[in-house]
Amino acid sequence: MAWIRTVAYENATGDLRKLYDRIKGPDNNVDNIMMLHSLRPHSMVAHMSIYKHVLHHSNNTVPKWFLEVLGVWVSTLNSCGYCVDHHFGGLKRLLGDNSKADAIKAGIDKRDIVSLPLTNKEKLAIRYAEVLTRTPEKTTKTLIDDMRSAGFSD
């Protein structure tokens, strides 16, 4: 629930209604994170653009499902339950394997990277995301070299 005023789908008009129509789900549901932009629809356009280009662009080399894993992980580190739920929904949809998705979520909930049903390369990316999220000043050349050696590129 937002602490600022938002405009619900049924009360939206003009450009906001057009934007809502592009992103609404079943029963005209608009995600809360998007409704936060309802007083400034131009910021919703920017939000959608950056999200699409960062997580869902066709030129990305990291699989979309794994980008959602990173989203769940970073959201957990940031204690953002709403974001965890959002990224976990995307993970389940993109992965298409609810058992594996649930196992990933269980490991993340315990903050147990070792137990995650992921490759060593993916676990390295999880560790890298943690450093960037919690202590970016502790990023080292060794960590970057390890990422490159594992197959990640700039």
What are these regions (language model features)?
Residues 71-72, 120-141:
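Amphipathic, charged-and-aliphatic alpha-helical interface segments
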Residues 70-94, 136:
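Short, thiol/selenol-centered motifs that function as redox-active sites or metal-ligating centers
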Residues 100-110, 150:
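Ferredoxin-type iron-sulfur electron-transfer modules in oxidoreductases and energy-metabolism complexes
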Residues 107-119:
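Acidic/His metal-coordination segments adjacent to aromatic residues that form catalytic metal sites
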Residues 32-39, 64-80, 154:
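Alpha-helical scaffold segments that form or flank carboxylate-/histidine-based iron centers
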Residues 1-64, 99-102:
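Mobile cap/lid helix-loop segments that border enzyme active or cofactor-binding sites
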Residues 138-154:
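Acidic interhelical loop/turn segments
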